[in-house]
């Protein structure tokens, strides 16, 4: 077929014509054709006359006759494509393997200094529908140029022709027209790219924590990129997570955590307690190892509370301590009763209830015979004698001097005597009260009963007259007596029944408002934090730090807390109850609540406000509650 040009042409020499030239394919259309002679160059094409020849070509034109058959051409194309893909996948796999330890940094508008294969050309198909080859035949094409080139291509009958601005940027295979892939094959190329990226993420354990759908990945980055990241690490790496209880979130602290932290909070305490309650001793021990207890005299009440709680939890894991019977603890307990208004006002409320039960006649005031099961250092009765003296001074001095008779029962727990100084100490207390009574013009009769077992408790064993008026004081006594949760004998209820058999006119009960007896371990920890935390804060706010007794009181509170949290069974002495449970227990023993008079409540309120505005006094179901900042710490009540 004549082409109209010198030098031969036409369809017969499409693959092997003598020289590269433009062949007219129709009105106003040309197709670029090269031959197999590398020395022959393309002729300069006339701008503005490029048209689509395929649209005007007659279908079924198979009259080409070349040096190679179609099958040979397709086989050559497939072989060349395999050779191009093999180094690409080898390079991609190498990049993925070498990038496992360091995740490359992604930069916007990054241009790789070392070229790589453009993935969009891997799956391109030729005009002949075979296992197609790339239009660029494996040459490196920057992504920006590829996108610009694709935007310049036109679509004709579903086939994109290689005409436009990017057609001559790179040499093409001689003898083959530069034809772009079919349009629907572009989606397959994108799918393959996405698949490779997913494979990359799986190999690198990439969870997209850097955020965003970043197109610049390990595959599209060059070797020099991740090598640069190895040489120059990220100046702001992810900091090590610091230890925190609350929390198990993935947020990190601004500074690197050390192996031991001096910061501990109530939340940390609850985390340790939860681990212990769930039997995860190793986890609890690990957390405790991170918490330091650096002695600091300037620590506030909250920090001291946490220190006590940590010591209690450590003791819970190791060997519990039982040091509540020592002389040091007895002294600290008495100091607590004297320095803390919540305890001191509770004793005073009990004294007022005892004085209200006295008989008034022409011969003078007849104070009931007081039976005390835990007199301590006698501080409560020092205040009782002074209050009685104040009342007496307000009346006619013609009356006879009042007589106060007190019987102190040696301290016993679970039916056994406790070595707290015994009879000698109690006699010393009696001597002190007698001397004070003499100065105040009050006659004091003080008796001591020792070696008395619970089953032998009666009027006769106490030295009481059959028709004598009695008052039994149980202030801060019952919480230390075991109940049915400790032993089947239930000494707590047995003591109440024995006291009921004495037929007293009044029974005074003062106890801490705290649920630490039968509460589960976690409940005890939470309750101890709330109760003893408020108590420590009240001591800190009312007792000057220069007072040497303050440290002793705080240490005593710490021992009480440790016993309540760390010990179980008979070793746990601190078994406080809330007022509601005491009401039920007293009612079951046959007692009836005697609401404290409004006069007593108002007197306690005025005294509490004079000490510190943070102390609160309120009536609650017949009892008077004393607390700190709204938290009830002690409750006083009277029974008959």
From Swiss-Prot:
Give the location of motif VHIID in residue numbers.
368-372
Molecular functions per Gene Ontology: DNA-binding transcription factor activity
Q: Which UniProt keywords apply?
A: Nucleus, Transcription, Transcription regulation
Function noted in UniProt: Probable transcription factor involved in plant development.
What are the GO cellular component annotations? cytoplasm; nucleus
Name the chain's protein: Scarecrow-like protein 8
Q: List, for all copies, the residue spans of the domain called GRAS.
A: 256-640
Keyword DNA damage tagged: no
Q: Where is this region: PFYRE?
A: 470-563
Taxonomic lineage from the root: Eukaryota, Viridiplantae, Streptophyta, Embryophyta, Tracheophyta
- Give the subcellular location: Nucleus
Q: What is its main location?
A: nucleus
Q: Does the keyword Transcription apply?
A: yes
Family indicated by similarity: Belongs to the GRAS family.
Q: Where is this region: Leucine repeat I (LRI)?
A: 263-317
Q: What's the short name of a Pfam family annotated to this entry?
A: GRAS
Name the Gene Ontology biological process terms. regulation of DNA-templated transcription
Region Leucine repeat II (LRII), residue ranges? 428-460
User: What are the transmembrane regions?
Assistant: none
Outline the segment boundaries, as ranges, of region: VHIID.
Answer: 333-408
Region (Disordered) residue spans:
1-39, 227-263
Q: Which organism is it from?
A: Arabidopsis thaliana (Mouse-ear cress)
Q: Where is the composition biased (Low complexity)?
A: 242-262
């Amino acid at each position: 077929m004549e082409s109209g040009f010198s030098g031969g042409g036409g369809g017969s020499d499409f693959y092997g014509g003598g020289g590269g030239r433009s062949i007219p394919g129709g009105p106003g259309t040309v197709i670029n054709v090269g031959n197999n002679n590398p020395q022959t160059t393309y002729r300069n094409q006339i701008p503005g006359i490029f048209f689509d020849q395929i649209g005007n070509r007659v279908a079924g034109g198979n009259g080409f006759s070349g040096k190679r058959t179609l099958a040979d051409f397709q086989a050559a194309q497939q072989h060349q494509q395999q050779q191009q893909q093999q180094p690409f996948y080898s390079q991609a796999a190498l990049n993925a393997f070498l990038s496992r330890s360091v995740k490359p940094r992604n930069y916007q508008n990054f241009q790789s200094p070392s070229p790589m294969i453009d993935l969009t050309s891997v799956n391109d198909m030729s005009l002949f529908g075979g296992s197609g080859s790339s239009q660029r035949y494996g040459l490196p094409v920057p992504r920006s140029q590829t996108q610009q080139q694709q935007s310049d291509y036109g679509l004709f009958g579903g086939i994109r022709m290689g005409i436009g601005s990017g057609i001559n940027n790179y040499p093409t295979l001689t003898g083959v027209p530069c034809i772009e892939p079919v349009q629907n094959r572009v989606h397959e190329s994108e799918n393959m790219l996405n698949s490779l990226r997913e494979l990359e993420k799986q190999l690198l354990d990439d969870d997209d924590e850097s955020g965003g759908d970043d197109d610049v990945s390990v595959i599209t980055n060059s070797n020099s990129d991740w090598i640069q990241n190895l040489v120059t690490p990220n100046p702001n790496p992810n900091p090590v997570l610091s230890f925190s209880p609350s929390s198990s979130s993935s947020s990190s602290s601004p500074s690197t955590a050390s192996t031991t932290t001096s910061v501990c909070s109530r939340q940390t305490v609850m985390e340790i307690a939860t681990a212990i309650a769930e039997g995860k001793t190793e986890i609890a021990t690990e957390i405790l190892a991170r918490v330091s207890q650096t002695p600091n005299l300037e620590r506030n009440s909250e920090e001291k509370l946490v220190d006590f709680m940590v010591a209690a939890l450590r003791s819970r894991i190791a060997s519990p301590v039982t040091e509540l019977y020592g002389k040091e603890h007895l002294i600290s307990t008495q100091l607590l009763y004297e320095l803390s208004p919540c305890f001191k006002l509770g004793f005073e409320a009990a004294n007022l209830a005892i004085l209200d039960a006295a008989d008034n006649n022409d011969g003078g005031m007849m104070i009931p015979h007081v039976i005390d099961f835990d007199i301590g250092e006698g501080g409560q009765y020092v205040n009782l004698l002074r209050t009685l003296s104040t009342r007496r001074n307000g009346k006619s001095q013609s009356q006879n001097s009042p007589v106060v008779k007190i019987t102190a029962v040696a301290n016993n727990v679970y039916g056994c005597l406790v070595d707290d100084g015994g009879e000698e100490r109690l006699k010393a207390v009696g001597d002190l009260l007698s001397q004070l009574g003499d100065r105040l013009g009050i006659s004091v009769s003080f008796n001591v009963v020792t070696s008395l077992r619970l089953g032998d408790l009666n009027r006769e064993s106490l030295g009481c007259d059959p028709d004598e008026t009695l008052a039994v004081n149980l202030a801060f006594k019952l919480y230390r007596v075991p109940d049915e949760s400790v032993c089947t004998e239930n000494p707590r209820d047995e003591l109440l029944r024995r006291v009921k058999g004495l037929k007293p006119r009044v029974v005074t009960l003062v106890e801490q408002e705290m649920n630490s007896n039968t509460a589960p371990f976690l409940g005890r920890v939470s309750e101890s934090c709330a109760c003893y935390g408020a108590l420590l804060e009240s001591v800190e706010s009312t007792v000057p730090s220069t007072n040497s007794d303050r440290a002793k009181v705080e240490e005593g509170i710490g021992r009480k807390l440790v016993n309540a949290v760390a010990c179980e069974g008979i070793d746990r002495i601190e078994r406080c109850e809330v007022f509601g449970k005491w009401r039920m227990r007293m009612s079951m023993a046959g007692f009836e609540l005697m609401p404290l008079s409004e006069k007593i409540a108002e007197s306690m309120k005025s005294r509490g406000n004079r000490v510190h505005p943070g102390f609160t006094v309120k009536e609650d179901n017949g009892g008077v509650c004393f607390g700190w900042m709204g938290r009830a710490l002690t409750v006083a009540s009277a029974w008959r």
